[in-house]
Amino acid sequence: MEQNTEKFSIFNSQFSILTSYFPDLTDRQKEQYAALYDLYTDWNAKINVISRKDIENLYPHHVLHSLGITHMLRFKPGSSVMDLGTGGGFPGIPLAILFPETHFHLVDSIGKKIKVGQAVAEAIGLENVSFRHCRGEEEKQLFDFVVSRAVMPLADLVKIVRKNIKKEQINALPNGLICLKGGELAHEILPFRNRAISKIGR
């Protein structure tokens, strides 16, 4: 009983942070985000998709970090986005909840991680997502944007996803790659210094 009370307290404090950043969430979106805590906690006990030391920080370190992309761009209805190296569904699933009229295609080379993402998406009733177990080099579809959370050096990532970017633009920003990375990036982004680069606090 005491353990359940502590778990609820952790969830409640973290979830309130999420809703403070996104006060206009619909009831449906709140339900979907709220369900992520138990779903990922349960799945993480079977398949390690999030550091077991970090699962209690699911909302600030994973959900909100994924939604940091909205600091740069709000996807227009009808947009298509590939999440490369999604792992258990980040940033794709949190973004798919927030943008129900955008399609998200989640790709990972590790099948068991895709299995977790599919199970979570099905459990919360996400209808604007698809999944594929493959390497990025194998995915040939075209998208408005590719998003990724630090799966590899930026130069390598650009080489892989360049083929996947549509030419026709419908969003406020030009089509391209949105990469969530931390640490010292000056050397890594130097070859792309003339591209749009924005710092997003975590």
Describe the role of every protein-language-model region.
Residues 2-5, 11-77, 82, 112-129:
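Class I SAM-dependent transferase core
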Residues 101-105, 109-202:
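S-adenosylmethionine
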